[in-house]
């Protein structure tokens, strides 16, 4: 998987071969499925993308898989991508990644009703920092309601954290083959970190989150 990751841009043929080898051996591995999905999508092989992503999503739902699935076919409209992701989400109705993927894609499609519908069941009992940030995006992009945006961003400070790639107390935006601390293989796991990853003040965090929302992105 690490080799496929390293040559994804420079040698896509080799990357596909390596990613598919890893995917075949372990259908629950996110990174090889995401790599293969992106590369097959770039070649217009939509059916292959769908099959690979669906196999892994059912075993290990993950945002990177949802993104690869959404962009499985070049030239699709935001509405097309939303419908595709909704179909994927239906296969894992009990995973929080399913409604989050739908809400994220709905926001990109400016379908505020669908975005709110996806997130509403999470607001009581399953609230997380990502959910709060998505709600802030909805309030900002749909209504330009700065007050509501800041309310939701303020709630991220005390909301439960979301899973991230983490190994030995280190958080990474992407999966890595080895721990930067111990060098151990396969150390990075997709899970909620035990300790805070930053010592920034609450005010600094709110400023950063507000900037991210204004850019239409989400924190990792």
Task: Report each predicted region and the residues it spans.
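Residue register within tetratricopeptide repeats
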Residues: 13, 47, 79, 113, ...
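TPR/TPR-like (Sel1-like) alpha-helical repeat modules
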Residues: 43-64, 123-129, 139-164
